[in-house]
From Swiss-Prot:
Biased composition (Polar residues): 559-577, 621-641
Name of this chain's protein: Protein THEMIS2
Gene deletion effect: Homozygous knockout mice for Themis2 are viable and produced at the expected ratio. Mice show normal B cell development, activation, or Ab responses.
Main location: nucleus
Gene: Themis2
Subcellular location, record wording: Nucleus; Cytoplasm
GO-annotated cellular components: cytoplasm; nucleus
Summary of the tissues where the protein is detected: Expressed in both developing and mature B-cells with high expression in immature, follicular and B1 B cells. Also expressed in macrophages and dendritic cells. Down-regulated in splenocytes of mice developing arthritis in a collagen-induced model, not in those of mice failing to develop the disease. Transiently down-regulated in splenocytes of mice infected with influenza virus.
Residue ranges of the region described as CABIT 2: 238-515
Amino acid sequence: MEPVPLQDFVSGLDPTSLPRVLRVCSGVYFEGSVYELFGNECCLSTGDLIKVTHVQLQKVVCEYPETGQTLELNPNFTGLFSPLTSLRSYRTLEDLVSAMPQNSTRWPIYFKSTQRIVTKASVVPEDQPLRLEAVEIHHGIRYARCVQVSKTKELLHLPLSQKGPFWRCKPSAPQTLHQILQDPALKDLTLSCPSLPWNSVILKPQYMLQAIMHMRSSIVKIPSTLEVEVEDVTASSQHIHFFKPLRLSEVLAGGGPFPLTTEILEVPEGPPVFLSPWVSFLRKGQRLCIYGPASPSWRVVASSKSRKVPRYFMLSGAYQGKLKRRPREFSTAYDLLGALQPGRPLRVVATKDCDGNEEENPDFSFLAVGDRLEVLRSGQVCGTKGQDIDVLVCQRLSEQSGEEEEDLEEIEDEAEDKEQILLPLYLSGSFVEEVNDSRRYNLVDLTAQYSLPCEVKVVTKDTRHPTDPLASFPGLRLEEKLTEPFLVVSLDSQPEMCFEIPPRWLDLTVVEAEGQPAQVARPLSIAPVEELSEAFYYSLRKLPASESQAPPPRPPKSQGINKKQQNIQSCKESSVKPQVVEPQKSCPQPQLKAKTLEALPKNKSNVYSKISVHKKDRKPNPQTQNSVLSMKPKTSSSLGKHSTMESHLLPDPDMDDHDYEEI
């Protein structure tokens, strides 16, 4: 093979033929010159051997032949290109036909126009390929019989006086940027693309070569625009041994043999993944011993619960510390629904007063500090404007202790007096889970029995990990469980420093080193807890495996003050004759959707009679019980009763709208 410029060699290279061995023949360089290429040094001298292992398209330069102007395109450019047979454009169809040779082989002629062609029958868009099949005469006027090169194959008769400009093109469908670059027949051809500002362009791709040098273990990145001539000597250099760089992901996929002694060639750039001491040893030239895949392959991401700056950890499935469950905290009713599991009761206590937005639906309940609830299921009700509102159906529990309440449920479950209430999913509040569990779990049992996230406290350290930091925190939040393969690795110079590396997030480039590892047997002690950097933690939480549920529904827009006062005044006027007025006209009452809420007996007594005096008064909501417990539409008598009761609840217009607490 004759020496060729590096750019020409790469442009005609078949990626499937890699790797290729090149010899540097000549180039523009001085004695001892060094090309700094993306952090890798490469001194190219005459006679150097380069083994090209990978070629990546960096960008494509488009050149306008008429003016020499250039434009850079990204490799993901989505425009379509069509090859042109010449650089000449034709003003009319007659000029195009006249330029063709006068023989039978000139038909058909493929062409296109850079302007729209408007006819009585249709409109031909710009850059639409056309096939000119023949010239016909109708009523003394010469027409070109053309067919659109498309699915419709519409037949057109265009007069030869039709103005363009027109361009001849090859009979092929438009192709993408990668298709054009991969076709050797289209190399250096003039192309047209509707997405570009010029009628014709020439593509000049630029590549980045990844290669290794003979007698050097470093990886070299060489741009194809480097002014150097090379010669392909792959066939005559089979006996020459090159170092073979590997990524940890390739070592993991290869499956061994293990242990494998390697030397680090390159460490990926970017923010740190782990904050462990062994990270500082991962640098170029460091020798590692790889023992194979870690077991088990699943991990748990956790964050500390403390008033100070939170810290983030990744726990191995082999973690042997003992954990106790802690009460979970919820800030919305939507979070309560997400934590509800089939077959597992969820009981919470309200830690602040919550208003259920009775203006949107009178059935929404008011919660006071200390209210105990049991989450039952989700449901739907109709709002005042007729829209569907997602709700959480809960059961208000009495103030008895959990053990006494369980005994009552076993003895007289049906007779116990409990009230069902509705909470809109958008309700913002503060709830704490009731936990009566003193068991000590290991990580395997805890993740098998309870869904994550989960609040825990590490009560016993992992005895194999003396520096276990998790026991020092008052609480730990187990965020999610991930399944990711890790490699067990140790420093060749310090076999006792053993750790696990995830190739997906820390894909080191290594080369197999000569010699046996200092420790052949698999290490027994591996740190089961690794601290994560804050940047990596948040990037990890964005992975598809950790995508959370859809955000909670937004609360309805609040009405203006004037509109509220008008509604109050209209309700007051309508309450003069409660037995006659129709509530839907002045204060429309929403109806529960029977398909989502179960029917219960109607003769339930009010649970407020059981509330102790020292508790804060709740807002009375006489319709909640009837609406929740009844599945049938309200009768006229019930509507009248509601109007009568509501008339007593209307505020006095002379009084302030605020509710002041008496001191």
